[in-house]
């Protein structure tokens, strides 16, 4: 029994050491990152149809803010649709989303029933994809507050047929409020300014978040 415990300890130490070395290499790579020349400079001329998926479960405190923001987006209205997937929310999320849908024809609300909800974000997004008609699909979390021109900024890169996915940079709105928000901000900085830069410079597979 003792040897099993010792083996577990050795494996944990080996794993943590390898992980530490990995972070050390990534940090050094990011520090000396120079970046390659862009294959093209997006000019915003490419404007495909876009579907924005917003999965939401008990998000009554923030769903109105994100929907109001999508209405304010500067992307051509006729090429944009917003699909809210209400994942069997027990609060007023669905009702708030429906109130926005009545005011803006670009907003659609898909309701998942009580027995269907709570099975994971991927299932909710797949449900939304069934209703999406856009050439490009975006995913925003319900607590996001995107820049007004975010759609044209990101879709511009898809003019290159070799581009299959694009990810924006997420920042924390209420960074100075609590220790938790400060730690999340630090994690985001490390992810974008170190991890992603190192992956690019080392020609590794990029990491795309779930939103």
Language-model segments: what does each one mean?
Residues 48-51, 81:
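Cell-envelope/extracellular polymer assembly enzymes that use nucleotide-activated donors
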Residues 137:
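Short aromatic/hydrophobic "clamp" motif used to bind/position activated sugar donors
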Residues 33, 73-75, 147, 165:
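Catalytic cores of nucleotide-enabled group-transfer and carboxylate-activating enzymes in metabolic
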Residues 101, 105-130, 134, 148-149, ...:
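Long helical/loop segments within the catalytic core of UDP-sugar-dependent glycosyltransferases
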Residues 26, 32, 36-38, 59-72:
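Short, well-formed alpha-helical segments that are part of the catalytic scaffolds
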């Amino acid at each position: 029994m003792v040897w099993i415990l010792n083996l577990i300890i050795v494996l944990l130490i080996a794993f943590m050491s390898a992980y530490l070395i990995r972070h050390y290499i990534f940090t050094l790579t990011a520090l000396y990152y120079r970046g390659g020349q862009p294959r093209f400079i997006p000019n915003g001329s490419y404007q495909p149809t876009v579907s924005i998926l917003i999965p939401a479960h008990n998000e009554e405190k923030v769903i109105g803010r994100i929907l109001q923001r999508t209405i304010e987006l500067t992307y051509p209205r006729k090429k944009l649709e917003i699909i809210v997937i209400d994942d069997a929310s027990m609060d007023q999320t669905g009702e708030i989303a429906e109130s926005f849908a009545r005011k803006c024809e670009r907003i659609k609300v898909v309701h998942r029933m009580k027995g269907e909800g709570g099975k994971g974000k991927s299932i909710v997004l797949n449900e939304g994809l069934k209703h999406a008609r856009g050439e490009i699909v975006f995913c925003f979390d319900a607590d996001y507050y995107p820049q007004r021109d975010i759609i044209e900024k990101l879709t511009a890169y898809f003019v290159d047929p070799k581009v299959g996915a694009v990810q924006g940079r997420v920042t924390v709105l209420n960074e100075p409020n609590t220790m938790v928000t400060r730690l999340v901000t630090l994690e985001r900085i490390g992810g974008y300014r170190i991890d992603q830069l190192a992956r690019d410079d080392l020609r590794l597979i990029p990491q795309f978040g779930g939103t």
